[in-house]
Curated annotation (Swiss-Prot):
Its EC number is 1.3.3.-. Disruption phenotype: RNAi-mediated knockdown abolishes production of dauer pheromone daumone 2, severely reduces production of daumone 3 and increases production of daumone 1. It comes from Caenorhabditis elegans. GO terms for biological process: ascaroside biosynthetic process; fatty acid beta-oxidation using acyl-CoA oxidase; pheromone biosynthetic process. The keyword ATP-binding applies. This is Acyl-coenzyme A oxidase acox-1.3. It is an enzyme of class 1 (oxidoreductase). Its cofactor is FAD. Keywords: ATP-binding, FAD, Fatty acid metabolism, Flavoprotein, Lipid metabolism, Nucleotide-binding, Oxidoreductase, Peroxisome. It catalyses: asc-C7-CoA + O2 = asc-DeltaC7-CoA + H2O2.
Length: 660
């Protein structure tokens, strides 16, 4: 049962009493195991006792400068109180959870330090380099970011323009951004906060370009924080969201760094300029793969946050009547509201479970690479490319539905859903634009189909082995039947897109033109393949659950998920599934909406997202929305005076003049 406290809204209390499972046990399933869920609660509790972390006013009422100053103030407070928390500075998950609790989703100076800068040092710096920089980074003696994207180049790494030219005479790399479009653009915390960056630049030796490589670059003096000679750096301005972060630009004019600042775990440049290539051509992409490998979980938590708000508020908000004309109905009792929210709730769980799988696959990949085995690189790169695209897009859709489900109050910043949306939707373009990501996965699918056509299906990776299977009609009486249906649709679309691409080349089109003319069909194949993987990940997680009440409700949520997902792509089932089967799937969806309804509030409570982190008046744990909405509105800076200076200066004279 969810926690119930004296003074809670009676409707939310009623919902929580209806729970058939223990939310702490559900949290253990969500976050992997009981120790992790318990640790998150301990961290949240310890942080709540540090009163200096309280905000003087809601973040949404702060200017951008105030937000950045507030995040810096809180980081300094945290640095003085670490010993009051069970925080482990070497644990990335600890850091991410604490920052979400304390700093919310507005961004902060350490956002990329812990998620990109340190992990890249771990994955790509040599032992000697780690001894030099990693400890300092973890102790926060230096603050770093990851600078790859340029003003004119994002997803296409091979077209990056920043150069690092090696000088054998001085054993230095000379960094330059030769054009305006070569400026590094967008990296978080680059503008004003970071004094170091891992910069991705083309490595040039004796006029030969060896492609993009990561370099450790000091940007600012460690005492004065003034940019070093040959470096121009600054903030790129306000954004759709995430305005507590100083996303920046960075340019170089013959800036010199030592040869040993090239990250050398997998590749080296000798003093005489000899280049030693990595064991795999795309080993340098591991930092991107790392970020993408956890994006499913991060986006799932963004979606979860929006659903905590929308589901709780829908249980508190009453509107209209059904059979009982004496009492208004909870909005959550309307089937349309359930249909709007519950499929997204299922997706949030599915994305988090999928994220844990891909994080595990990435960890295994790092171990394999250290042993000289890079065979899993292509598989994981393809998978995370597809997941990144599908999950970010569906998360954006789900958050927007959650906002609209809150009615007019969802449009207010008091709901905080618009901020969650703005942060989450950025994932559709950072770390690779979504359409490009789908096409990267499509290349992998096309190669797989070509292997089958040439009789080499034994070379297929496990994630695409279904492409060689024979189709069959699904038995929808079991979950495996839904997997069979999805496999059939994904397989047929992958073959259809590949055949179109190959046929265009046979008619004389170049590979590039044929690819472009097949691109829409190829992206459809990638989406279906990815959605199949998500369903299977959800099923695998549910199959391992031991607690019976938790397993029962998640099995219901899984049934809701597969029925909704199959209906969502029903056009691909033409000539494969009958209208009777589709009607059955639709009826099953409505059945599972009803089954999930009594557990909805406890399912969102199980994410255990605190009020401090949620920052939402509508999604408060206690459900006391309306009195706090009025309190929130009164705290608006416009209400400091009854008459605004602009009224005295402009509107009153205008009205007086109109009376003459």
């Amino acid at each position: 049962m969810s926690s119930i406290c004296k003074g809670d809204n009676s409707d939310l209390t009623e919902e929580r009493k209806n729970a058939t499972f223990d939310t702490d046990k559900m949290a253990a399933v969500i976050y992997g195991r009981e120790e992790i869920a318990s640790r998150r609660r301990q961290l949240t509790e310890s942080i709540s006792r540090i009163h200096e972390l309280a905000e003087s006013k809601p973040l949404v009422f702060m200017t951008r400068e105030e937000k950045i100053a507030e995040s810096c103030r809180k980081l300094e407070v945290l640095s003085r109180h670490w010993n009051q928390t069970p925080f482990n500075r070497d644990n990335e998950e600890d850091a991410l959870h604490i920052y979400r609790e304390v700093l919310g989703m507005e961004g902060h100076p350490l956002a990329l330090h812990d998620t990109m800068f340190i992990p890249t040092l771990v994955a790509q710096a040599s032992q000697e380099q780690q001894e030099k920089w990693l400890g300092r980074a973890r102790r926060k003696e230096i603050i770093g970011c990851y600078a790859q994207t340029e003003m004119g180049h994002g997803t296409n790494l091979r077209k990056l323009e920043t150069t690092a030219t090696y000088s054998p005479d001085t054993q230095e790399f000379i960094l330059n951004t030769p054009t305006i479009t070569a400026l590094k653009w967008w990296p978080g915390a680059l503008g004003k906060s970071s004094n170091n960056a891992i910069v991705v630049a083309n490595l040039l030796i004796k006029d030969q370009n060896y492609g993009p490589h990561p370099f450790m670059v000091q940007l600012r003096d460690e005492k004065t924080h003034i940019p070093l000679k040959g470096i121009v750096v600054g903030d790129i301005g306000p954004k759709m969201a995430f305005n507590g972060a100083d996303n920046g630009y960075l340019g170089f004019n013959n800036h010199r760094i030592p040869r040993t600042n090239l990250l050398m775990r997998h590749t080296k440049v000798e003093a005489n300029g000899t280049y030693i290539k990595p064991s795999h051509a795309k080993i340098g992409y591991s930092s991107m793969v790392k970020v993408r490998s956890r994006m499913a979980m991060d986006q799932g938590l963004f979606l979860a946050s929006a659903l905590v708000i929308a589901v709780r508020y829908s249980a508190v908000r009453r509107q209209g009547f059904l059979e009982d004309k004496t009492q208004k109905v909870k909005v959550l009792d309307y089937q349309t509201q359930q249909h709007r929210l519950f499929p997204s709730l299922a997706r949030a769980y599915a994305f988090i479970f999928t994220g844990f799988e891909t994080i595990h696959l990435y960890s295994q990949l790092l171990k394999d690479v250290d042993m000289g085995n890079t065979s899993g690189m292509a598989d994981l790169h393809a998978l995370t490319s597809g997941l990144k695209s599908v999950v970010t897009h569906q998360t954006g859709e789900g958050i927007e539905q959650a906002r609209m489900a809150c009615g007019e109050h969802g449009y207010s910043m008091a709901s905080y859903i618009s901020e969650i949306y703005g942060v989450a939707i950025g994932g559709c373009t950072y770390e690779g634009e979504n359409m490009v990501m789908l096409l990267q996965l499509a290349r992998y699918l096309v190669k797989s189909v070509e292997l089958i056509k040439s009789g080499e299906e034994k070379k297929l990776g496990p994630m695409v082995s279904y492409l060689a299977a024979k189709g069959g009609h699904p038995d929808l009486s079991s979950l495996n039947g839904y997997v069979t249906a999805f496999e059939h649709m994904a397989r047929r679309q992958a073959w259809k897109a590949t055949e179109k691409f190959l046929k265009l080349m046979e008619t004389g089109e170049s590979r590039e033109v044929a690819w472009n003319k097949s691109a829409v069909e190829l992206t459809r194949a990638s989406r279906l393949h990815t959605r199949l993987f998500i369903i299977e990940a959800f099923m695998r997680r549910v199959s391992r659950i031991e607690d019976i009440p938790v397993k029962e409700v998640l099995t219901d949520l899984l049934h809701l998920h597969v029925n909704y997902e199959l209906l969502d792509v029903a056009t691909y089932a033409l000539e494969f599934m009958s209208s009777t089967q589709l009607d059955y799937i639709r009826d099953q969806l409505y059945l599972y909406l009803e089954k999930i309804r009594p557990s909805a509030v406890s399912l969102v409570d199980s994410f255990q997202i605190s009020d401090m982190q949620l920052r939402s008046v509508l999604g408060r744990r206690d459900g006391n929305v309306y009195e706090n909405l009025f309190k929130w509105a009164k705290s608006s800076p416009l209400n400091k005076s009854d008459v605004l200076p602009s009224v005295d200066k402009y509107l009153k004279p205008m009205m007086e003049k109109a009376k003459l």
